[in-house]
Design a protein with these regions (language model features):
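N-terminal targeting leaders
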Residues: 2-7, 13-16, 21-216
Length: 216
């Protein structure tokens, strides 16, 4: 059991080491290279998303304490709430609070009523999440760095900025990952023309890091 846990942690550690750029991962004894495309959010929106996550997570933890286990994920100013709460009142209050925050475009309230998940269950979700992300990274034509993937109770929740074909492929990859029960996608769908524009902007930002993206 301890060996299996160490193995899971190793997989997660290796994955996280190259999620932000290009990396090499040994799969089945063969080294494979993963190329991660640039984030399609502007630097400003990325900062807003991080701020929303920190603000909401801190406030909800202080307000509800052990009565709730709430995960807050924001992507392109759309906020996803997952986890467990004691009752409908807390579930609704959590969503209403997040909706009231400045810069929040929408809230996806996926909280369930029930006891807080165990640490073992959360560790399993982390491991399953690493498997899904690895599959995304090694799937051609999937912009894994323009997606946020959350796993809760073996269910996969996805946020991101994708074309329709990319979104369909992402849902297929997640659904086919062993251990996944159900997949929920909350994507911003863009056209191929917008995709090309954002990728061009991303390449320009690599040479001029301080230049803001036009995509908001």
């Amino acid at each position: 059991m301890q060996t299996q846990s160490r193995g899971k942690l190793l997989v997660i550690g290796v994955l996280l080491s190259f999620l932000s750029g290009c990396g090499v991962l040994a799969v089945g004894g063969v080294a494979a290279t993963a190329s991660v495309m640039a984030d399609r959010r502007s630097p400003g929106v990325q900062a807003i998303d991080k701020g929303l996550e920190l603000e909401a997570d801190s406030a909800l933890s202080k307000r509800f304490g052990s009565s709730a286990h709430i995960n807050v994920n924001s992507f392109n100013q759309k906020v996803l709430l997952t986890g467990e709460v004691k009752n409908d009142e807390i579930k609704n209050q959590a969503a209403e609070y997040v909706k009231s925050l400045k810069n929040v475009r929408s809230v996806f309230n996926q909280l369930i009523i029930g006891p807080n998940s165990s640490y073992a269950a959360r560790a399993n979700d982390s491991y399953l999440g690493s498997k899904v992300k690895t599959q995304m990274i090694f799937t051609e034509k999937l912009p894994s760095n323009s997606m946020d993937i959350v796993v809760e109770a073996d269910n996969v929740y996805m946020l991101g900025i994708l074309t329709q074909s990319e979104a369909d492929l992402a849902k297929k990859v997640a659904s086919n990952t062993n251990g996944v029960k159900e997949v929920f996608a909350f994507f911003d769908i863009i056209s191929d023309a917008e995709k090309a524009r954002l990728e061009k902007l991303g390449k320009a930002e690599e040479t001029q890091p301080t230049s803001p993206s036009k995509f908001q």
